[in-house]
Every structure is written in structure tokens, then in C-alpha cells.
Amino acid sequence: MAKRRVDQMLVDRGLVESRTRAQALIMAGLVHTPDRRIDKAGEQIAEDTPLTLKGQDHPWVSRGGIKLVHGLEHFGLSPAGLTCLDVGASTGGFTDVLLHEGAAKVYAVDVGHGQLAWKLRSNTEQVVVLEKCNARALDTAIIPDPIQALVCDASFIGLRTVLPAGLELCVPGAWAIALIKPQFEAGRDAVGAKGVVRDPAVHDAVCQMIHEWWSGLPGWTVLGIDPSPITGPEGNREFLIAARRDG
């Protein structure tokens, strides 16, 4: 496995905005691998090593916001003035970014409860909190507004299962960005220890499968797939897929 400088890896994964910031965090003792603290910015480690920050280095209520910011920039999409649906809202990292980027309204859907950050939960003018809500059962009785943008960062369930109902609520011209998580899409035999999928061939196969599925939905066009700037839990690689509804 090739090795790379830790400070550059932090930048490339979107955990920090610059090598200078990365070096400052390393000197402060805030950068860790799963088994130790990184002490030198110039240290070279295996390029697939999971890295975490013990202090927050982004403005969002969760690090998930980093992923959506990258997706919006990469695919050239904007939620400004739109009514949006956040599937698998959890703490609200994606909802936070949508509002920051000018979304008019966000329906924050999650099967759990009590997770959404207070600053979002208390924004009753723009955020509709739908807790204990099964995204597979969404309809116009639950969400009466036409959805113009959909985002999804769901866990323990595949996109082909969790997205169809929400996508049906999207109007022509709407766009969507979702995270492909191979550990929840691949077969059990492809998932290794601690639920980690390390084989690039499995990553490619899963991304191709989701691309073909979404492309086959009436009226939808896939805009592309791009690696997430940061890894998921335990170092799992994740991928952002974007699509637009044409009709």
C-alpha cells in the first residue's frame, strides 16, 4: 500500500481546508488514526488509513455537511430558494448546509428521534421535523409541498430501498444528491471486518449498480458519481451520486 503525508491526506479528504490548518491540528494533538495519535505533519502512513479529528474543524452540526458541500460544488447544484427533502437527516449536517446555501424550506426525515441539532429543530419557519418517519412510506399526505431538491445520507439501508418514495415527490427540474455506501449495498460476502468494504472492485460494482438503477427510473438522468471527500465510519469509502428529474 502506498504511503502519503498525513497533512496532505487531511486536505484531500476534505477534513481541513489547507495543509497549514492540518499541520496546526496535528501539532495540537487532534488528529488520530484508529490506534494512535499523529504527532508529525510530515509523517507518511498508508493512504487508506482512517483519520479522525478529535475537535470540530467545520461549521456544520455534523461532519456530514462536508460531504454535501463537496457534492454541491462538484455537480454545480444549488438549493437556493428551493423546497428540499433530507432523507436520513440524523443530526442534520445536510439540512444545515441546505439552509446555509439558501434553501427556502427543508423537510428533515429520519426513522429515529431526538437526533436533529437544536439550532435546526428550533428553526420552525424553515425546517419541518419528521421524526420516527419511515422514508419508504413518504407521500403527499406527509409532505404536501412539491420537492425541488432531495439529499440523502442514510445508513443501514440501501438507496434502492430508501429513495423511491421520496423521488416520487420530486417535481420536473428537481435534483438529488445521495451518498452511496457500499457496506449497505454489497452482499455480505463483500463486507469485511467491522463492516468495512475495502475492495475497489466492489466499490466500482456498487456504484455501477446504483447508476444503472437510478438511470432506469422514469424521468431521471444521472449527472455523475464522485468519491466523498471524507470516509465514513471505520474508514468506509463513500460516493456521491447526483441526478436530475427531467420529466
Model-inferred region functions:
Residues 79-90:
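Conserved class I S-adenosyl-L-methionine
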Residues 107-157, 161:
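S-adenosyl-L-methionine
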Residues 1-47:
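A basic, amphipathic helix-loop patch mediating RNA/tRNA/ribosome contacts
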Residues 31, 104-109:
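Short beta-strand element of Class I
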Residues 182-199:
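Short, glycine-/aromatic-enriched active-site segment of Class I SAM-dependent methyltransferases
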Residues 91-103:
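Conserved SAM-binding loop of SAM-dependent methyltransferases across substrates and taxa
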